[in-house]
């Protein structure tokens, strides 16, 4: 099935490498969080929601590994220790849920004060408009927290894109290369998996989605990782959203 022949009721989009450049995430968002995490924790250390995140971070298996790397770990957990651990997680590109939540709070300040604007490719808002006009829903599934997802689309370079989006999912529903995560999303959307089209740049995610019954297409945006020949043969590949701008709803309940 080619992109021009596809039909769906929901388009489920990844962010990094799909709607948004990988360089924005790695060269702007991650460094911003690293640079500001210590100041943020210092100023908000006593707040209940921050302390909940701190407690969750201490339960992460890598926390013990990080402390073992320190020449003189502090006797008590303080904001400097947690800030260092968060920087360690970012450097290791470990997608830990409480760290992602904390990043989202830090980025929120950056978006609010105008230091950050969410990058989206130029074909994204055009596709969003076309899909919604055709009656499709658009949902987001990213390893970044739901709060961070809303910030990128709510404070994008082209304005607020949130009105086009009907649902957001992060690692609270499961990891992105696990079949069950996509089964959970389909249930939460109350939609037949075959009527959900997942767009991503990661073959492992596309495979997990397809094993759950979803349709899946891989984006080959500039800067995305190169694909092996078997991966290219296994999935439909598109360079951007333009081939999908005429995506239509299924004609009836029997058509995928």
Curated annotation (Swiss-Prot):
GO molecular function term, any single one: acireductone synthase activity
Record flagged with keyword Membrane: no
SUPFAM superfamilies associated with the record: HAD-like (SSF56784)
Positions bound to Mg(2+): 14, 16, 201
Enzyme class: hydrolase
Subcellular location(s) of the protein: Cytoplasm; Nucleus
Catalytic activity: 5-methylsulfanyl-2,3-dioxopentyl phosphate + H2O = 1,2-dihydroxy-5-(methylsulfanyl)pent-1-en-3-one + phosphate
Family recorded in the similarity comment: Belongs to the HAD-like hydrolase superfamily. MasA/MtnC family.
Function according to Swiss-Prot or TrEMBL: Bifunctional enzyme that catalyzes the enolization of 2,3-diketo-5-methylthiopentyl-1-phosphate (DK-MTP-1-P) into the intermediate 2-hydroxy-3-keto-5-methylthiopentenyl-1-phosphate (HK-MTPenyl-1-P), which is then dephosphorylated to form the acireductone 1,2-dihydroxy-3-keto-5-methylthiopentene (DHK-MTPene).
HAMAP family the UniProt entry points to: Salvage_MtnC, Salvage_MtnC_euk
Protein known as: Enolase-phosphatase E1
Organism encoding this protein: Drosophila erecta (Fruit fly)
């Amino acid at each position: 099935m080619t992109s021009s022949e596809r039909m769906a009721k929901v388009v489920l989009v990844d962010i990094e490498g799909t709607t948004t450049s990988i360089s924005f995430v790695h060269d702007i968002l991650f460094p911003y969080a690293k640079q500001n995490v210590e100041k943020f924790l210092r100023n908000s250390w006593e707040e209940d929601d921050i302390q909940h995140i701190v407690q969750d971070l201490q339960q992460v298996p890598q926390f013990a590994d990080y402390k073992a790397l320190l020449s003189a770990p502090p006797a008590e957990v303080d904001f400097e220790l947690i800030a260092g651990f968060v920087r360690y997680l970012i450097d290791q590109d470990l997608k830990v849920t409480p760290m992602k939540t904390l990043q989202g709070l830090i980025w929120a300040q950056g978006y609010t004060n105008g230091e950050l604007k969410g990058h989206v490719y130029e074909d994204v808002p055009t596709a969003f408009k076309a899909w919604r006009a055709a009656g499709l829903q658009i949902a987001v599934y990213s390893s970044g927290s739901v709060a961070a997802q809303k910030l990128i689309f709510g404070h994008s370079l082209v304005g607020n894109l949130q009105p086009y989006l009907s649902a957001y999912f992060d690692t609270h529903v499961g990891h992105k290369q696990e079949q069950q995560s996509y089964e959970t999303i389909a249930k939460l959307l109350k939609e037949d998996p075959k009527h959900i089209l997942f767009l991503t740049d990661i073959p492992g995610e596309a495979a997990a989605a397809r094993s759950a019954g979803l349709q899946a297409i891989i984006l080959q945006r500039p800067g995305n990782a190169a694909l092996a020949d078997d991966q290219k043969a296994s999935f439909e590949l598109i360079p951007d959203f333009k081939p999908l701008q005429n995506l239509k709803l299924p004609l009836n309940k029997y058509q995928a």
